[in-house]
Amino acid sequence: GNIERRTISMPLSRGNYRLIISGPAGTVFIGEQKEGVTGLVIQKYTLDKREAKEFISGAIQVSVSNDGNKMLAKVGSDWKIMNTTSATGSDAKSVKISLKTHLDRSAEWKQIFEEAWRYERDYFYDPAMHGRDWNEVYQKYAPLIPWVKHRTDLTYILDQMNGELSVGHSFVFGGDYPEVDKPSCGLLGADLVPENNRWKIKRIYTTESWNPELSSPLDRPGIKMEEGYYLVGINGKELTAADDPFQFLDGALDVQTTIHINKTPDFKGSWQEVVKPISSESNLRQRVWVEDNRRMVDKLSGGKLAYVWVPNTSGGGFVSFNRYFFAQQDKKGAVIDERFNGGGLLDDYMVDLMNRKLRAAITNEAPDGVPFRLPAGILGPKVLLINEMSGSGGDFFPWVFRQQKIGP
């Protein structure tokens, strides 16, 4: 008893600690995620000495035996076993695992489907199954199972069956998928359109040049590049509108690549620029979409309204809200955009900030001076944009927005 009174602090340095496992008497193993290290760095903490020393590094999975004397760890692709009583895991011995099994995939997929159906039948919180005849649902989807030829097909059917309940936070995860090579096609962070039998650079996407995820490879210091120029070649090969530019960029991911640029649709007279194509344009295009929306709201309102995008109700959403909400306190009102909101927490933080009322102000006697107001924020009217693509906390956010009478 009184376990809370037997709690002691462990004087560890700051770190991203992801795991703690008890070891032999008087020791604890702590897993730390360090920057640039694949897997966890496992430290052995000794209670009597109040110190931690590195035991093994690069552990992906870790388990300690019930008696605390042995540790099994997956390091890279190898499984290793070691004595926990040693100062380090240097005595680790590799465990050879060469297990093979023969599976009847069709029978396995049928079993998975039926078990998933039974899980919902037996454990769904509402015995009435949200008004659905669950046996009827089985008869609807079961005939599709013999036609499944890939795990993706099965996952799609499970998703559709699950969707019959019209309930949130009921997901389909996992599955054995074939291993395939990762795409190595590089992207330029730009819109290319065919024109004059060439690929014209219609738009270069960039927002924050200091952020590698939010800047186009074509928008780097020292590169002679403008929207409206033509991409006429890649790595010495001439490129026409009949060619797929992404085929030319296959294998160029994170590799210095020579592109040929011209103001006119001609290969002759073009110049070369060296760029490093990126793996994804998602964050870049998303930020540009947000900034385009902000500029549009500012233009249509004559500079009176702010635009605040809330991508989710978790960390990223709070960062975006704080960034756009408090930076536009001079606006008379705000358009809050939570379309495509990915959810997270049941928000009260953002709603509470938007529900603030003016408490006080400090006058500013300078010519055209703006009074300093308390509390901080946009205190004028607000409207919330929503769509059907939000979920979880993204569903609760609009409800509480209206419930608190912040706006429509």
Predicted regions mapped to residue ranges:
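Multi-bladed beta-propeller domains
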Residues: 2-15, 46-60, 87-105
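PDZ/PDZ-like domain segments forming the peptide/carboxylate-binding groove
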Residues: 182-241, 391
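Non-catalytic interaction/regulatory modules that flank or connect domains
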Residues: 3-7, 11-45
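Terminal targeting/pro-maturation regions of precursor/exported proteins
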Residues: 91-169, 195, 199
